[in-house]
Amino acid sequence: MAYRFEVLDLNFQNVPHTIAVYLFRHDKGLALIESGPGSTVPALEKALTARGFTFGDITDVLLTHIHLDHAGAAGFLARRGATIHVHPVGAPHMIHPEKLLKSAGRIYGDMMDTLWGEFLPVPEEKVHVVQDEEDIVIGDLRFTPLDTPGHAYHHYAYMFEGVCFSGDVGGVRLPLGNNTRHLRLPMPPPEFHLEKWRASLTRLREAAPRAIVPTHFGPYEDVNWHLDAIERELDDVEGFLEAVMPSQPSVEELERKLDGWVLEKNQRDGIDPETHHAYETANPTWMSASGLARYWKKFRQSQ
């Protein structure tokens, strides 16, 4: 299938095929979906240079959401001229990222700088707040954002010429190993929400994309399998929670149980240790354990 975009591999933490940026050419320069984290700016520069471009050629960056692996370099690119398109709930945190960075610091601790690098604020005049289904027209490119919470409340998937750039609501699926039909859900705190994710999945189905392109790491043309896999994972996660959480495990105990659950799925799908490491780099199990614990306590424990 022919596409009007290019996949740029940011080689996050020296692990290929874990974080992508998607590049589009138009008559006045380049547009990107995602910026990647600040730590991968050198990899982004290398990819641009190989194509004869510089940071100054980037006119627009469309963010699926503001988590550091997707939006961390947006401020850097904005200061070199790019307009940053973002969900209205996420926009204030791009301009004033102190709360976002404090929250991330609680999660990542001493690993913050190594993993994510510098997160610069985006100048307010470089932020374009985008509403649900409001077309973004850049030269001869037209993108349509779809409000798709579940991974985060401020999440957009973008439709472009029948292709869905699904951010994280489309799951994590890496083109590695012997089996590329393996999908995991990234479920971080504080905004993972099972029911909202189900509603977003319905919306993705209704969009009827011809291909689906998760940030971790596309594209894929077996759209029906992919969307069905998301639904199976949501069902499996709910079953896991209902089996495990009534005993009120600590987050550490929950993480151990979730690790075992993930390894069982690896065995089922024939996932080798190197591929598992790549999945853990893109979507660490310990982070999902924290997200699941928070979701259960806030939304399910009192039911």
Which functions belong to the PLM regions below?
Residues 1-55, 158-167:
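Conserved beta-strand hairpin/beta-sheet module of binuclear metal-dependent hydrolase folds
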